[in-house]
Amino acid sequence: MTINEDAKKKIALLSQGLPHYTHLLSLYAFQRAASTDRSHVEIGDVRTAIDTALAKTQQSIISTYHRATNSPRENLYSQVLLSCALAQPDSLGYFSAVDVRKPLTILMNKPYEIPAFSQHLNAFCEFSRGPVLQRTGTARRFRFRFENPLMQPYVVMDGIRKGLINDDLKSSKS
């Protein structure tokens, strides 16, 4: 079997260097191609693989994501968490609130300042919303990273599935 270069790049981008998601997305994309009697994987097969991978994700990831984003009221928790997943991390996987601002502004199609979502970041570090993020540093200089490295790609793929971002990890509203 062979794979389209764009499909290969998409799998690498979505898996964010984690073998777990690289293998999972590849497996489901190749299975999709084989199930339709093709020996070549296309980008559409990867899109289908995203849905399958999300449906078969570890229950602990799904439960933590649900706890982090679920609320009876209208809120920004899922958008802020997606923005965290899209934020540019440092070499250790940490990002700051400043790094979250740009993806959130693009995602919501309006400017957001740090005070508008800083309580969300702090909540993600507490048991009531996860904890989905780890926090290090001191006040006004906090750095965050995902508690479980498998959560970040899951959040991105869920954003694609929900139509919040496109396959190129850009806002679907732009």
Cite the ranges covered by each PLM segment.
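Conserved small helical "lid"/interfacial subdomain of P-loop NTPases
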Residues: 1-7, 14-20, 25
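Amphipathic alpha-helical interaction segments
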Residues: 6, 10, 24, 79, ...
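Short acidic, glycine/proline-enriched loop segments that cap or flank alpha-helices
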Residues: 2, 91-92, 109-112, 134
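Short, Lys/Arg-rich nucleic-acid/phosphate-binding segment
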Residues: 134-143
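Amphipathic alpha-helical segments within well-ordered protein domains
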Residues: 9-12, 105
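Winged-helix-like regulatory helical subdomains adjacent to P-loop NTPase cores
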Residues: 23-109
